[in-house]
Amino acid sequence: MEVVIVPDAADAAALVADTIGALLEREPEPVLGLATGSSPLAVYDELAARYERGEVSFANARAFMLDEYVGLPADHPERYRTVIEREFAGRVDFAPGAVQGPDGTAEDVAAACAAYEQAITASGGVDLQILGIGTDGHIAFNEPGSSLASRTRIKTLTEQTRRDNARFFGGDVDAVPTHCLTQGLATIMAAKHIVLLASGRGKAEAIHHLVEGAVSAMWPATILQHHPHVSVLVDPAAASRLQLADYYRQTYAAKPDWQGL
């Protein structure tokens, strides 16, 4: 696991966009994993800006979303498929149908989850997965207590997550769905490269557990310690509880530019 402490979200976005740009050039049919929430927004803005300048193209790429609310109507503005289209996919040149997500409207939830797992496998797997992290250490909607071997499934959201997400629903916690479909921790771990973004002091405890704590289902993100290629990009506030912060700064400063993330 590599920890990169950056001045702010813009610096993190530039690093991630560089990495994705290199992937788009290197792979004939690259597969991205897309997260929602506030953490990746600066990355999506940077990628859209580079697309507008003709620096990157997603025409040959595919993408898979991490999760989706259950029960929101298809036209709801906070349905994650709508959010991804608005914040990123609709601003670049993905081919029609190239961006897929779990079907939160499916009547047969188990079948929908199995089909989504199969679609990811059939694509050849995710080359680069973007992640955020919850204040309680959840990634995607794998809440504390989630099985470290879990696959795509339906989950009940914790009250903490619903409170955290209420800002997207006009501050109304009751408007936040109680259930979701989410990629499991084992599904996420199958990605070849994972890039996790976090900013703000509110994420400091979760980042401390992720990087320096014991692997535990109570802090689901800690499973990433077992992945061979994880990049954790954090601002100074999110890094404020890291005991080895100076070491992480030193090792990244000494890293050759050609190596990238």
Swiss-Prot record:
Q: Which PROSITE patterns match?
A: GLC_GALNAC_ISOMERASE (PS01161)
Listed under GO cellular component are: cytoplasm
Q: What GO molecular function annotations does the UniProt record carry, in alphabetical order?
A: glucosamine-6-phosphate deaminase activity; identical protein binding
- Does the entry feature the keyword Plastid, yes or no? no
Q: InterPro entries annotated for this entry?
A: Glc/Gal-6P_isomerase, Glucosamine6P_isomerase, Glucosamine6P_isomerase_CS, NagB/RpiA_transferase-like
Q: Which residues form the active site?
A: 67, 136, 138, 143
Q: Which EC number(s) does UniProt give?
A: 3.5.99.6
**Which UniProt key words apply to this protein?**
Carbohydrate metabolism, Hydrolase
Cysteines paired by S-S bonds: none
Q: Name one GO biological process term.
A: carbohydrate metabolic process
What does the record give as the reaction this protein catalyses?
alpha-D-glucosamine 6-phosphate + H2O = beta-D-fructose 6-phosphate + NH4(+)
Say yes or no: keyword S-adenosyl-L-methionine present. Answer: no
Q: Which Gene3D superfamilies match?
A: 3.40.50.1360
Pathway given in the UniProt record: Amino-sugar metabolism; N-acetylneuraminate degradation; D-fructose 6-phosphate from N-acetylneuraminate: step 5/5
> Which Pfam families does the record match to this protein?
Glucosamine_iso (PF01182)
PANTHER family found in the cross-reference section: GLUCOSAMINE-6-PHOSPHATE ISOMERASE (PTHR11280:SF5)
Protein family per UniProt: Belongs to the glucosamine/galactosamine-6-phosphate isomerase family. NagB subfamily.
Q: What does this protein do?
A: Catalyzes the reversible isomerization-deamination of glucosamine 6-phosphate (GlcN6P) to form fructose 6-phosphate (Fru6P) and ammonium ion.
The identity of this protein, by name, is Glucosamine-6-phosphate deaminase
Q: Which gene encodes it?
A: nagB
